[in-house]
Amino acid sequence: MKQYNDLFKIIHREGYIFIASFALVSFLLASFNEKLGCIGFIATIWCIYFFRNPDRFVPISDDLVISPADGIIQEIKEASPPPELGLGDLEMIRVSIFLNIFNIHVNRIPANGKILALHYNPGKFFNASLDKASLYNERQSVLMETDQGQKIVFVQIAGLIARRIVCDLEEDNEVKMGERYGIIRFGSRVDVYLPLKTALLVSKGQTAIGGETIIADFGRKKTEEFKFERK
């Protein structure tokens, strides 16, 4: 029984219906045409691959902010967070992480703290790599306060292909860095907004690993040896 539980654990629950549907269609196609069945089988394998949900080795520190998603650091710039969160024209550092269809799309909490506000904003589906996607695309915005008293924002943004954002958070949730909190289907972007004086530890073009890559440090000794735990 444990082996079956472990198997389901490594696949995000949002993928179950897709995988089952692909498998059923593949079986039906194979009964009519072997080549079509093979194509369906390959599509089913890809679907399993897309919804993979592996454990990560998460750093243990209240001063760190980690990447909430796998992908490429596409842009780092000063920008105001989504207006629906009520922060006004406050300028923050925005780190944008672009996910292609081959990246893991499970999203993780970037820091230890408490969820202050959430807001879902329906919108368009421009290519997530475009700068205007942050403003116009469908998005789920989250405002949290870290255990060190810093306010940060992270935003799930739908892309050209992605048509569903899943966020399992609620206001007043106490959250831990690296915990899974949602997923975006299929190809997307995640923005992280940090206070202007935050020391960044990533650069544009860098590959980020959700739950592991440290993107910022709120001020502990830079020589500190960080510990990690599996989640």
UniProtKB/Swiss-Prot annotation:
What topology in the membrane does the UniProt record assign? Answer: Peripheral membrane protein
TM region positions: none
Q: One Pfam family for this entry, by name?
A: PS_Dcarbxylase
Q: Subcellular location, in the record's words? A: Cell membrane
Post-translational modification as stated in the protein's UniProt record: Is synthesized initially as an inactive proenzyme. Formation of the active enzyme involves a self-maturation process in which the active site pyruvoyl group is generated from an internal serine residue via an autocatalytic post-translational modification. Two non-identical subunits are generated from the proenzyme in this reaction, and the pyruvate is formed at the N-terminus of the alpha chain, which is derived from the carboxyl end of the proenzyme.
List the catalysed reactions: a 1,2-diacyl-sn-glycero-3-phospho-L-serine + H(+) = a 1,2-diacyl-sn-glycero-3-phosphoethanolamine + CO2
Q: In which pathway does it act?
A: Phospholipid metabolism; phosphatidylethanolamine biosynthesis; phosphatidylethanolamine from CDP-diacylglycerol: step 2/2
Q: Which family does it belong to?
A: Belongs to the phosphatidylserine decarboxylase family. PSD-A subfamily.
Self-association and partners: Heterodimer of a large membrane-associated beta subunit and a small pyruvoyl-containing alpha subunit.
Protein name, UniProt field: Phosphatidylserine decarboxylase proenzyme
